[in-house]
Amino acid sequence: MDPCECSKTGTCNCGGSCTCKNCSCTTCNKSCCPCCPSGCPKCASGCVCKGKTCDTSCCQ
């Protein structure tokens, strides 16, 4: 389950490791928020995101 509350509030904070604003990831260490690169439907569980995107190898 995705802990991100973006769909409800537009913002989320995932255990301190991930912060979203307006449903876009601003800082992220885990794939708890939609910070995948364009064309990537979701990042693999436990994927480390760098900046606003994760590595394409994390795509699933």
UniProtKB/Swiss-Prot annotation:
| Role this protein plays | Metallothioneins have a high content of cysteine residues that bind various heavy metals.
Positions of the region Alpha?
29-60
Record GO terms (molecular function) = metal ion binding
Superkingdom of the source?
Answer: Eukaryota
UniProt keywords (A-Z) are:
Acetylation, Copper, Metal-binding, Metal-thiolate cluster
UniProt KW Heme keyword: no
The UniProt entry, under InterPro entries, shows: Metalthion_dom_sf, Metalthion_dom_sf_vert, Metalthion_vert, Metalthion_vert_metal_BS
Q: Which residues bind a divalent metal cation 6?
A: 36, 40, 43, 59
Q: Which gene encodes it?
A: mt
Enumerate the residues binding a divalent metal cation 7. 49, 54, 58-59
Q: Which Gene3D superfamilies match?
A: Metallothionein Isoform II
Matches recorded under Pfam families: Metallothio
Instruction: Tell me which residues bind a divalent metal cation 2.
Output: 6, 12, 14, 25
- Could you tell me what this protein is called? Metallothionein
